Amino acid sequence: MKQDSRFPNLFILDHPLIQHKLTHMRDKDTSTRTFRELLREITLLMGYEITRNLPITTKRVETPLVEIDAPVIAGKKLAIVPVLRAGVGMSDGLLELIPSARVGHIGVYRADDHRPVEYLVRLPDLEDRIFILCDPMVATGYSAAHAIDVLKRRGVPGERIMFLALVAAPEGVQVFQDAHPDVKLYVASLDSHLDDHAYIVPGLGDAGDRLFGTKN
């Protein structure tokens, strides 16, 4: 895991397996089926990385030989909240890793001026719960920042929120950081820039279209 000096709350997950799978996802010739499988696999790997600092407590268990105090994750079950629609493809990998997690949804689409328009919010109970928001791309950063706003307006502090994405543009990370410096953003790659249409370059195309086999 590495950082970029420009963005204190950005963490780049540079594990070789993550980078290998991301390269295949970038390939325009990768099929919908393979893209979907890779998204699940890469999210599972990234989820493993970002949960390494979860709080731990102990539980008394009896092995076939003795009783011991063994480590377990402390507190309430985590919540996974994909940002619709492409974020749904990431929830499968996270649920494979954390099958007991609660699941919410935040629906946001990007208007013509690239600003987020919210159309759905469904969340589990919020008190004392750690949230993992997920969306494959942080382009302009407005949708990601808005999704965090949804949680914070309901009383979730920034230190209990993580945001997981595959690729991000520096412009979007700056918007994210300015809005929520207390929230950690985890990505597989910090890409070069946004083009004139606010697409990430080099990026991986429209993640939602590639995941669901639709045309923009």
Curated annotation (Swiss-Prot):
Pfam families noted in UniProt: UPRTase
Q: Which HAMAP family match?
A: Upp_B
Q: What does the UniProt record say this protein does? A: Catalyzes the conversion of uracil and 5-phospho-alpha-D-ribose 1-diphosphate (PRPP) to UMP and diphosphate.
Q: Which residues of this UniProt protein bind 5-phospho-alpha-D-ribose 1-diphosphate?
A: 85, 110, 135-143, 206
Keyword check for Cell membrane, yes or no.
Answer: no
Q: Which cofactor does it need?
A: Mg(2+)
Pathway annotation: Pyrimidine metabolism; UMP biosynthesis via salvage pathway; UMP from uracil: step 1/1
Query: Where along this sequence does the record place binding of uracil?
Result: 200, 205-207
Keywords of the record = Allosteric enzyme, Glycosyltransferase, GTP-binding, Magnesium, Nucleotide-binding, Transferase
What's the source species for this entry? Burkholderia thailandensis (strain ATCC 700388 / DSM 13276 / CCUG 48851 / CIP 106301 / E264)
Swiss-Prot/TrEMBL catalytic activity? UMP + diphosphate = 5-phospho-alpha-D-ribose 1-diphosphate + uracil
In the record, the note on similarity to other proteins reads:
Belongs to the UPRTase family.
PANTHER family given in the database record: ADENINE PHOSPHORIBOSYLTRANSFERASE, URACIL PHOSPHORIBOSYLTRANSFERASE, CHLOROPLASTIC
**What Enzyme Commission number(s) does the record list for this chain?**
2.4.2.9
Q: What is this protein called?
A: Uracil phosphoribosyltransferase
